[in-house]
Curated annotation (Swiss-Prot):
GO CC terms, sorted: cytoplasm
GO MF terms held by the record: DNA binding; tyrosine-based site-specific recombinase activity
Residue stretches making up the Core-binding (CB) domain: 7-84
Keywords of this entry: Cytoplasm, DNA integration, DNA recombination, DNA-binding
Swiss-Prot/TrEMBL GO biological process terms: DNA transposition
Protein name: Tyrosine recombinase XerA
Entry annotation: catalytic residues: R135, K160, H226, R229, H252, Y261 (o-(3'-phospho-dna)-tyrosine intermediate)
Top-level taxonomic group: Archaea
Chief subcellular location: cytoplasm
Function according to Swiss-Prot or TrEMBL: Site-specific tyrosine recombinase, which acts by catalyzing the cutting and rejoining of the recombining DNA molecules.
């Protein structure tokens, strides 16, 4: 009986993943939603708001943060809607999260972190998180073909919400990419690959977190990858870059959408990057 339930649940998870994909959810979101739903099934719960609350209470007791519980709620609400149980989905309310941004690093702190990188790969990872404002998942998914060496920009594919965007990069940052690629001895299509594995798989988010933590610790700082992205936005704003341009650079607008906040062209984005000179400052150029 249990084996039959596992087969049924496996089929449901597969169908739910397809549904999420058609809804335009990113691969990372699909992975997280199906993971939480599988845990929901494993505990033997039924698709009702009452059972969902029991599940959430158990997760909270086990140490889940309010922010993590919000993600679980979104996953369950999506599943209930997938099953046509909209009334049950409506009963689930997201707890309010205090709005807070991670503490921004100073330019001097970023410079110190970059300066202690052990190798060109790690240095470039830090520079892209900061100098291009990338999310960890976006960094890991970057392929070499996403770097336009002639026109000096990155194509970030499948960002949050499955959105793509173009990020102009400075000549200095492009040079760092070229310098790093000359050291690569593998045929992986990805810009960054794992070092310790026999197969050169693409870089994992866990590795990014670990190396950022490692280099932060070397200079006496507790740093996260998102702090580098947040520092990118903060330092751009401090240097007079329009907040609407920063929002687009961060990926808060779809590549095909040109008028969400205001009309912003690639030319203006490039001027913003060149005006800020973030990488040049960090590298002392």
């Amino acid at each position: 009986m249990k084996e039959r339930e596992e087969i049924v649940n496996s089929d449901i998870l597969e169908e739910f993943a397809t549904y999420l994909e058609l809804e335009g959810k990113s691969k990372n979101t699909i992975r997280m939603y199906t993971y939480y739903l599988s845990k929901f099934f494993e505990e033997g719960y039924s698709p009702t708001a009452r059972d969902a609350l029991k599940f959430l209470a158990k997760l909270r007791k086990s140490g889940y943060s309010i922010r993590s519980l919000n993600l679980v709620i979104q996953a369950l609400k999506s599943y209930f809607k997938f099953e046509g149980l909209d009334s049950e989905a409506e009963k689930l309310k997201n707890p309010k999260i205090p709005k807070s941004l991670p503490k921004s690093l100073t330019e001097d702190e970023v410079k110190k972190i970059v300066s202690v990188a052990d190798n060109l790969r790690d240095k470039l990872i830090l520079l892209l998180l900061y100098g291009a404002g990338l999310r960890v998942s976006e960094l890991c998914n970057l392929k070499i073909e996403d770097v336009n060496f002639e026109k000096s920009f990155l194509i970030v594919r499948g960002g949050k919400g499955g959105k793509d965007r173009v990020i102009p990069i400075s000549k200095t940052l492009l040079f760092e990419i070229e310098r790093y690629l000359k050291t690569r001895k593998d045929n992986s299509p990805y810009l960054f690959v794992e070092k310790r594995r026999n197969r050169k798989d693409k870089l994992s988010p866990k590795t990014v977190w670990m190396l950022v933590k490692k280099y932060g610790k070397k200079v006496g700082l507790n740093v996260t990858p998102h702090q580098l992205r947040h520092s990118f936005a903060t330092h751009m704003l401090e240097r007079g870059v329009d907040i609407r341009i920063i929002q687009e650079l961060l990926g808060h607008a779809n590549l095909s959408t040109t008028q969400i906040y205001t009309k912003v062209t690639t030319k203006h984005l490039r001027e913003a990057i060149e005006k800020a000179k973030l990488i040049e400052t960090i590298l002392g150029g």
